[in-house]
């Protein structure tokens, strides 16, 4: 279970356009409908290229995983319950969903000026999946610890991240030897890159060497 949870051997296509960062830098300064409408043709070109990138990566992931679908998130923000009424996101966000019912978790790529990262794991697990994760950790937490603390994994993906319950999840004692892991409501691993990394021609080679 632990191996399936965190393993991701991914190879990306060579590069993305640096115009992505230029566009979002300008949008962050002019986050209004008038400016966006004037620059929508430019956005559509970038959106199309990112979709092609996502579909290409989906094919590559399917060489060693089981990916059901790729999703590029909409640029329009839901401002109904937000104090921030700016209408547009200032980043591209995309996700690759693993094939159910046999596979869980997924992958996410975030493209924003000076905030580029790849993530894998469980961002919003449903109650059944979260229950299963906790049961597996309770049964053999050391297996999971060995995996996420292995030097070759940790040097790339860093520390386990995610929201936690304050004390102990229902059904588990506060003095459970694996309580530090059981408290997690999310299981996320992340690797960050610079703007230059994501558009560099050798980006795929750097990932291969990770």
Where do the protein language model's features map onto the residues?
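Active-site acidic/histidine clusters and adjacent loop/turn architecture
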Residues: 20-21, 25-75
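Compact, glycine/acidic-enriched structural inserts
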Residues: 113-167
